[in-house]
Design a protein with these regions (language model features):
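A short, solvent-exposed beta-edge/loop patch
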Residues: 155-187, 247-249, 331-350
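One face of beta-strands
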Residues: 39-45, 120-124, 239-242, 249-255, ...
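Contiguous hydrophobic, core-forming segments of folded domains
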Residues: 25-28, 37-39, 163-205, 252
């Protein structure tokens, strides 16, 4: 297989995947209606712009003209696609859910409890059959039970799975899930300026990914104890709230420190991180443009470089598609002990260089490929089989002497 072809094909394949704004993404009220008030961690993923919208592109990836040029790569990709489709079909046959069409978003809430598995509630939005909870718990030896006329499924280990009156699927510890399945459930109001209010502000911007940490004092201490003395340990121990989010046009983060002095350090670190993000766009562009400019000088020296020369326009196009010019907008503000960072471009790849890894590999191939003369290793000396012992032939007996001729008689 030509080394350059699969690398170029996969880099170009990345340009086929996109993340677009989802105007129908859950609002903060919808995402947090079943929130666990004392949760230490919150995770939210909008599956529509990430998985559902891009799955058809994944299905057609092996038919991409550039990938089809490499039979081995295309065959390997089709094998993976077949396995993925097999898993998708198996899940659909077992529980009646198409993982790439029926799920729209999910939100998870976790509450730490020492070194054990945290208590949690997972909230899944989508299209679900009324008997889904029962079908999910049956293989685990679970039993059905009814909550406000809807069938839920209880597992032997204390988990409960059920559908709410609005059709949302909940799963988690029984004491957390059962009250949320009831028709009478109402979320607690969010106090102005609280951690939940900050999380809601981020969710109302309709990001496709959110990770928030609002640890209790005990959870923060336990987590910090697992990290050696370092800036990372201080980040854990000093935060009251941390939120990271990603949208179709950029990324952002919020950090609420225990005091303004540490918040000032976070502000400085955030400004430095943004400079690195800008450099992550410019450096790969510079490396690839330099390499492409130099390529013609090495024509005919290796098949890899010749193939790169053939596709140099596509290489530059991939650079433009997967990186930006580093000129995205960014604001870093500090108000007391709260630091807020917002970045924005025309698209996510203008801010977050999603192709930097692939382009880095490509640059390494372009700059590091050298013609190698074919070498033939000398054949190892052949082992001579030992000579078979030979039996000496007997020495022939000498022929008898002829009898003397008698003298003549006189």
């Amino acid at each position: 297989m030509n080394l350059w072809e699969p690398i170029l094909a996969m880099i170009m394949a990345l340009t086929s995947f996109t993340i677009k704004p989802n105007p129908k993404a859950p609002t903060a009220d919808a995402a947090l209606v079943y929130a666990v008030d004392d949760a230490d961690v919150v995770v939210h993923v909008d599956l529509q712009p990430t998985l559902i919208d891009n799955y058809p592109t994944w299905q057609k990836l092996a038919d991409d003209p550039l990938i089809k040029q490499n039979a081995e790569l295309a065959a390997g990709l089709r094998t993976v696609q077949t396995q993925v489709e097999g898993g998708r079909a198996m899940v659909k046959n077992l529980i009646g859910i198409d993982l790439t069409a029926d799920l729209t978003s999910l939100t998870g809430f976790a509450r730490m409890r020492g070194a054990g598995v945290p208590d949690f509630v997972v909230v899944v939005r989508g299209k679900f059959a009324a008997d889904l909870p029962q079908r999910l718990v049956q293989p685990m030896g679970g039993k059905p039970e009814t909550i406000d006329g809807r069938v839920a499924g209880a597992t032997p280990d204390g988990m409960l799975i059920g559908l709410t009156k609005d059709g949302t699927l909940l799963a988690g510890q029984r004491d957390l899930v059962a009250p949320r399945l009831a028709d009478a459930w109402k979320p607690a109001p969010r106090a102005k300026g609280s951690a939940w209010a900050q999380i809601a502000t981020v969710l109302d911007q309709r990001p496709f990914f959110v990770l928030a940490s609002k640890p209790s004092a005990a959870a923060a201490t336990a987590l910090a104890a697992q990290v050696n003395a370092s800036f990372g340990r201080d980040l854990i121990a000093q935060h009251q709230l941390a939120i990271v989010s990603a949208s179709a046009t950029g990324v952002g983060w919020v950090y609420q420190a225990k005091d303004a002095a540490f918040a000032a350090r976070i502000k400085l670190a955030s400004e430095g991180w943004i400079e690195l993000m800008r450099a992550a766009h410019i450096a790969p562009r510079g490396l690839v443009e330099l390499a492409v400019a130099a390529l013609p000088s090495y024509a005919g020296t290796s098949p890899e470089l010749d193939d790169a020369i053939k596709h140099k326009d596509k290489i530059l196009a991939a650079v433009d598609e997967l990186t930006g010019d580093g000129k995205f907008t960014a604001t870093v503000t500090q108000k007391g002990n709260l630091v807020t960072v917002i970045t924005k471009g025309r698209r996510l790849s203008d801010v977050l260089p999603v192709g930097v890894v692939g382009l880095g590999v490509a640059s390494a191939v372009l700059l590091g490929a050298k013609p190698k003369a074919a070498t033939v290793s000398p054949r190892p000396p052949m082992m001579q089989p030992p000579a078979r012992p030979s039996t000496p032939k007997p020495t022939p007996r000498p022929a008898p002497r002829p009898a003397p001729t008698p003298a003549p008689t006189r």
